[in-house]
A protein has these predicted regions:
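Short, charged beta-turn/beta-strand-edge "cap" motif at the junction between a beta-strand
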Residues: 132-135
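N-terminal, Lys/Arg-enriched amphipathic/low-complexity engagement segments
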Residues: 1-22
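Asparagine-centered strand-capping/turn motif at beta-strand->loop junctions
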Residues: 137-140
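Long, compositionally biased interface segments
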Residues: 155-198
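Short, conserved beta-strand element in jelly-roll/cupin
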Residues: 57-74, 78, 149
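A short hydrophobic beta-strand segment most commonly corresponding to one strand
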Residues: 142-158
Length: 198
């Protein structure tokens, strides 16, 4: 289970490495029923009513997202000085890459507007460039799984934009090693697709 984690980016989310080619990973994400991705609702976070669990972020490479089970919403935003979405800018050091993730506020607030809200179901696919900003929403209490395939690495500084105070995020609760038994339980759940408990 090397480089596979539970509570990855947010509570109740698993990241399982399926394949690796050099710096390029193929990972499966699984949101258990206790996940916190419901806090990224485009219909609530856009009004700043609920602090997001995963801020809008780009990646160190181009990615492709493919739905495996359930429904996810890939919510993308873009810069717009007249946009109504006001978010703080944070410099991000990945907990996946170095296991010591942290956010530092840059002192800047940025303004954005919606670019896309794409519902991804089983077999659905979205491709994104490294510079595109997104977050993932899953309905509270439901389970979902999706595949993320990485493209060529890009040299870029990674920022995250959020309506939550990310400097106060407790990383001790995130990026825990996932056991082989947990991975097998997730695999059985995906095969049966019955939404049973992990």
């Amino acid at each position: 289970a090397k480089n596979s984690y539970k509570n990855c980016h947010a509570g109740g989310v698993y990241s399982i490495v399926l394949a690796s080619r050099g710096d390029r990973l193929q990972r499966m994400f699984f949101a258990d029923s206790i996940h916190e991705l419901y806090k990224n609702s485009p219909w609530e976070a856009s009004e700043c009513n609920v602090p997001m669990s995963v801020g809008f972020h780009g990646h160190h490479c181009d990615i492709a997202i493919t739905g495996l089970m359930g429904h996810i919403v890939n919510w993308e935003i873009e810069n717009d000085i007249q946009g109504r979405l006001h978010l703080d800018e944070y410099l991000y050091s990945s907990g996946i890459l170095n296991k010591n993730g942290c956010f530092v506020w840059t002192g800047q607030e940025r303004t954005f507007r919606d670019k896309a809200r794409v519902i991804i179901t089983e077999g659905g696919r979205v491709e994104m460039s490294a510079i595109e900003l997104h977050t993932i929403y899953v309905k509270g209490g439901s389970r979902a799984a999706w595949l993320v395939e990485e493209g060529e690495p890009a040299n870029r500084v990674s920022y995250t934009y959020s309506n939550a105070d990310l400097e106060k995020l407790n990383f001790d609760k995130l990026y825990h090693t996932v056991s082989e038994s947990e991975i097998l339980a997730i695999a059985r759940l995906l095969i049966s697709n019955d939404g049973g408990a992990i």
